[in-house]
């Protein structure tokens, strides 16, 4: 008997339907038309196309992220699932106070800087006292009129007003009754003495001090008349016994009736100038 004929009649490995389906499906991949005719080949083709599209989109996004963020962008784009999980865990956790941890670690925390926006100065309301120089005056006046000041605050203007006020106060003090020039009483004319013209008090004092060598000689000069603006307010003046003070020996003898050219307290007497001593006594 021929062996080939036996194989055809009794096959060694009988084929099943599953095996025939796999073989036919593999043969259908040879062309698009035959693949679309086979059901299994069509499903496999559609799934493969979808996966290929997802892979292409993933790679294109990673390339664009690399151009924008550098090489690390590729890893972040490929591991998007890991990144999403990390972000989700980060949102669930409590925020960490880095400044507190730095203090515990022994590192000084940075100084806190608070930035505030620059605002324009607001206009203020001042009372109108009907004066030209009322830019920053905040005083009560009889007028009840209130007007809005449109100008902004100016430090130079405030300084100028302060100087003007100080100047006005000094002028008022200069014209006060306490600083008015004193009245000078007419001195009595004694026998043998003639009135002498008035002269400067300072020059008279220097001249009398220079003539200390001739103490026995009479000083033929009138007692000086001092100006209160030069010696202050508290000066002592007495018109009694003026003739005794005109003598030369009055410089060596203390006299309680001598007019003091310097300010004194409680109107104490002036002892005069002593040629033997270099200090003055009040």
Swiss-Prot record:
<keyword id="KW-0640">Prion</keyword>
<keyword id="KW-0325">Glycoprotein</keyword>
<keyword id="KW-0472">Membrane</keyword>
<feature type="glycosylation site" description="N-linked (GlcNAc...) asparagine">
    <location>
        <position position="132"/>
    </location>
</feature>
<feature type="compositionally biased region" description="Polar residues">
    <location>
        <begin position="253"/>
        <end position="282"/>
    </location>
</feature>
<feature type="region of interest" description="Disordered">
    <location>
        <begin position="246"/>
        <end position="282"/>
    </location>
</feature>
<dbReference type="GO" id="GO:0000329">
    <property type="term" value="C:fungal-type vacuole membrane"/>
</dbReference>
<dbReference type="GO" id="GO:0005886">
    <property type="term" value="C:plasma membrane"/>
</dbReference>
<feature type="glycosylation site" description="N-linked (GlcNAc...) asparagine">
    <location>
        <position position="91"/>
    </location>
</feature>
<dbReference type="InterPro" id="IPR037504">
    <property type="entry name" value="PSI_induc_2"/>
</dbReference>
<feature type="glycosylation site" description="N-linked (GlcNAc...) asparagine">
    <location>
        <position position="276"/>
    </location>
</feature>
<keyword id="KW-0034">Amyloid</keyword>
<feature type="modified residue" description="Phosphothreonine">
    <location>
        <position position="141"/>
    </location>
</feature>
<keyword id="KW-0597">Phosphoprotein</keyword>
<keyword id="KW-0812">Transmembrane</keyword>
<keyword id="KW-1133">Transmembrane helix</keyword>
<dbReference type="GO" id="GO:0005935">
    <property type="term" value="C:cellular bud neck"/>
</dbReference>
<protein>
    <recommendedName>
        <fullName>[PSI+] induction protein 2</fullName>
    </recommendedName>
</protein>
<feature type="region of interest" description="Disordered">
    <location>
        <begin position="153"/>
        <end position="183"/>
    </location>
</feature>
<comment type="function">
    <text>Not known. Seems to be able to provoque the non-Mendelian trait [PIN(+)] which is required for the de novo appearance of the [PSI(+)] prion.</text>
</comment>
<feature type="transmembrane region" description="Helical">
    <location>
        <begin position="43"/>
        <end position="63"/>
    </location>
</feature>
């Amino acid at each position: 008997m021929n062996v080939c004929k036996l194989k055809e009649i009794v096959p060694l490995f009988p084929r099943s339907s599953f095996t025939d389906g796999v073989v036919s499906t593999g043969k259908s991949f040879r062309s698009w038309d035959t693949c679309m005719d086979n059901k299994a080949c069509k499903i496999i083709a559609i799934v493969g196309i979808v996966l290929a599209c997802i892979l292409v989109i993933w790679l294109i996004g990673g390339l664009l992220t690399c151009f924008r963020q550098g090489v690390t962008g590729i890893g972040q784009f490929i591991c998007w699932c890991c990144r999403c999980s990390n972000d989700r865990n980060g949102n669930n956790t409590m925020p960490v106070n880095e400044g507190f941890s730095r203090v515990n670690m022994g590192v000084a925390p940075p100084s806190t800087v608070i930035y505030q926006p620059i605002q324009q100065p607001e206009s203020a309301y001042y009372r109108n006292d009907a004066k030209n120089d009322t830019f920053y005056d905040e005083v009560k006046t009889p007028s009840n009129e209130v007007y809005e000041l449109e100008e902004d605050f100016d430090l130079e203007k405030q300084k100028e007003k302060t100087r003007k006020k100080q100047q006005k106060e000094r002028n008022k003090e200069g014209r006060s009754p306490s600083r008015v020039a004193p009245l000078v009483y007419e001195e009595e004319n004694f026998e043998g003495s003639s009135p002498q013209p008035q002269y400067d008090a300072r020059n008279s004092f220097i001249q009398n001090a220079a003539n200390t060598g001739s103490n026995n000689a009479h000083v033929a000069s009138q007692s000086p008349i001092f100006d209160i603006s030069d010696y202050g307010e508290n000066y002592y003046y007495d018109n009694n016994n003026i003739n005794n003070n005109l003598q030369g020996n009055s410089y060596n003898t203390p006299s309680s009736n001598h007019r003091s050219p310097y300010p004194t307290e409680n109107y104490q007497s002036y002892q005069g100038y002593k040629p033997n001593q270099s200090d003055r006594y009040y």
